[in-house]
């Protein structure tokens, strides 16, 4: 990779820093999550939450959403210019759940955004701490990835629901910066670009004038982000072509969808980081842990350690299975919605089941749900082993871009084979030659055809005991090679709707 010299690690993106050494990165990431923890503690004090209520993941999510909303400048400006009935642009709030006489009750709270911003800045040494905000966005995005399916969104942009494993980060806001771009899947980027091109087709002024210039810059930037996710020269060359198009239209949409399909075998590199709910950082800070001094990494043992000794609760609906609710949150915490279930199960130490078999709905509770019947349970977020998170698509033989893993986007750097049904994927390409420049297409299809399902990815990489913090003794698991585990098989999850 030619750009290796300029690549920043994701901790640097996360903290907005320039190139730093490992210790500085650990310290600045530590400062970021410590700030989130301090903010959370302060909010619990403001809201007079008991210890138990403060550990409730639904309360954590409400508090996180309030601070994200308080700092959403674009939306705040929009709300002030377009006042809508019953929405105070200067206030933010949400449901807080309290324990009263052995029952859970919902209380809707409202706060001045200014006040929330003040508390957040105070917890972050007076700074805006955008990195911490992005971190919370990524946690929400990971939770959405584990909870909802995006079939409708895929179909609307002309993609195939089978491409769901490319959709990591599809609910991240546009303002999530470099750290957000790093965790977006190939399908997510393609979808954003296709939507943009469609707007340009329908609205003549989209690419024109002063605004059009800004639009064009955004378009090219998104193309470059997507290009950087591809690992083969032919895929990148096609991206150059899409980016340089004078007037992007249907030909570009065709090319992008072709590229998205190709990413099912020639995986893009997508970053994974373990972003935890604010209450987890709050608990650690409250117990006297100094994140900045100790240092912290989103891709190593630290999040596993933290979850190992945090007790987090969740509201449970009458017919939900608490173990399944725990699995959902565990996957969200480790950004493992698109990981092979064989790998996740091994690391977690308990069987991780596909989403179609989960008896649980999302974590958030709608305002019209009946609280009378709500119970709460401890979430089991501990793991048997830990593993390093990856930012590659799992290409085999020394990252020479051959096959990555289909219908999964590997999260953990752990050796596994890549079982995939080549026939199914190649079927998606038959007769689809009407785009342009068929030589790049031919090259991409040739690479896909030569990918072998028995290839091993992440060769020699293993998991580690939780006592092995320096990652000295990798344990390389052996998996049943015939059996691929995608989380999305037999899917019946709800759609994600804003």
Curated annotation (Swiss-Prot):
One Gene Ontology cellular component: viral nucleocapsid
KW Glycoprotein (keyword) present: no
SUPFAM superfamilies: flu NP-like
Disulphide bonds in the chain: none
Alphabetical GO biological process terms: symbiont entry into host cell; viral penetration into host nucleus
Segments carrying motif Bipartite nuclear localization signal: 198-216
Region (Disordered): 1-21
Motif (Unconventional nuclear localization signal): 1-18
Source species, domain of life: Viruses
PTM field: Late in virus-infected cells, may be cleaved from a 56-kDa protein to a 53-kDa protein by a cellular caspase. This cleavage might be a marker for the onset of apoptosis in infected cells or have a specific function in virus host interaction.
Location of the protein in the cell: Virion; Host nucleus
GO molecular-function terms, A-Z: RNA binding; structural molecule activity
Pfam family membership, one: Flu_NP
Keywords tagged on the record: Capsid protein, Helical capsid protein, Host nucleus, Host-virus interaction, Ribonucleoprotein, RNA-binding, Viral nucleoprotein, Viral penetration into host nucleus, Virion, Virus entry into host cell
Function recorded in the entry: Encapsidates the negative strand viral RNA, protecting it from nucleases. The encapsidated genomic RNA is termed the ribonucleoprotein (RNP) and serves as template for transcription and replication. The RNP needs to be localized in the host nucleus to start an infectious cycle, but is too large to diffuse through the nuclear pore complex. NP comprises at least 2 nuclear localization signals that are responsible for the active RNP import into the nucleus through cellular importin alpha/beta pathway.
Quaternary assembly: Homomultimerizes to form the nucleocapsid. May bind host exportin-1/XPO1. Binds to viral genomic RNA. Protein-RNA contacts are mediated by a combination of electrostatic interactions between positively charged residues and the phosphate backbone and planar interactions between aromatic side chains and bases.
Annotated family: Belongs to the influenza viruses nucleoprotein family.
Protein name as it appears in the record: Nucleoprotein
Gene assigned in the entry: NP
């Amino acid at each position: 990779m030619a750009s290796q010299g300029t690549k920043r690690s994701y901790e640097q993106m996360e903290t907005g820093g320039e190139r730093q050494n490992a210790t500085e990165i650990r310290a600045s990431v530590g400062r970021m999550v410590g700030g989130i923890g301090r903010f959370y503690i302060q909010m619990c004090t403001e809201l007079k939450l008991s210890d138990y209520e403060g550990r409730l993941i639904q309360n954590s999510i409400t508090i996180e959403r309030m601070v994200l909303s308080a700092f959403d400048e674009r939306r705040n400006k929009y709300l002030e210019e377009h006042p809508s009935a019953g929405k105070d642009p200067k206030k933010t709030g949400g449901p807080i759940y309290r324990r009263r006489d052995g029952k859970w009750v919902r209380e809707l709270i409202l706060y001045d955004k200014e006040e929330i911003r003040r508390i957040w800045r105070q917890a972050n040494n007076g700074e805006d701490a955008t990195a911490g905000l992005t971190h919370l966005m990524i946690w929400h995005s990971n939770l959405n990835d584990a909870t909802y399916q995006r079939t409708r969104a895929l179909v609307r942009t002309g993609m195939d629901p089978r491409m769901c494993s490319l959709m990591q980060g599809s609910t991240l806001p546009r303002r999530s910066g470099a750290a957000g771009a790093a965790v977006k899947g190939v399908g997510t980027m393609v979808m954003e670009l296709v939507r943009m091109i469609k707007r340009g087709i329908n609205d003549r002024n989209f690419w024109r004038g002063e605004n059009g210039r800004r639009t064009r810059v955004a378009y090219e930037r998104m193309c470059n982000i997507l290009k950087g996710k591809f690992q083969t020269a032919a895929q990148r060359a096609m991206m150059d072509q899409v980016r340089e198009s004078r007037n992007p239209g249907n030909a570009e949409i065709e090319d992008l969808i072709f590229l998205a399909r190709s990413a099912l075998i020639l995986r893009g590199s997508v970053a994974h980081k373990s972003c935890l709910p604010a209450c987890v950082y709050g608990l650690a800070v409250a117990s006297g842990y100094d994140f900045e001094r100790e240092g912290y990494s989103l891709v190593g043992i630290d999040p596993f350690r933290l979850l190992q000794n945090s007790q987090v609760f969740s509201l449970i609906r009458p017919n939900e299975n608490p173990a399944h609710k725990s699995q959902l949150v565990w996957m969200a915490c480790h950004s493992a919605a698109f990981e092979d279930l064989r790998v996740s199960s091994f690391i977690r130490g308990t069987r991780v089941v596909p989403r179609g078999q989960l008896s649980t709905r999302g974590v958030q509770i709608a305002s019209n749900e009946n609280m009378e019947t709500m119970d709460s349970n401890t979430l089991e977020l501990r793991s048997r082993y830990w593993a390093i998170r990856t930012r590659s698509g799992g290409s085999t033989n020394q990252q020479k871009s051959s096959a990555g893993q289909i219908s999964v986007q590997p999260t953990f750097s752990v050796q596994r084979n890549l079982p995939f049904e080549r026939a199914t994927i190649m079927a998606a390409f038959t007769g689809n030659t009407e785009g342009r420049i068929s030589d790049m297409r031919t090259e991409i299809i040739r690479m896909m055809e030569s990918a072998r399902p028995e290839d091993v990815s992440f060769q020699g990489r293993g998991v580690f005991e939780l006592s092995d913090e320096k990652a000295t003794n990798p344990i390389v698991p052996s998996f049943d090679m015939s059996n691929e585990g995608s989380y999305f098989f037999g899917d019946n999850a709800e759609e994600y709707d804003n």
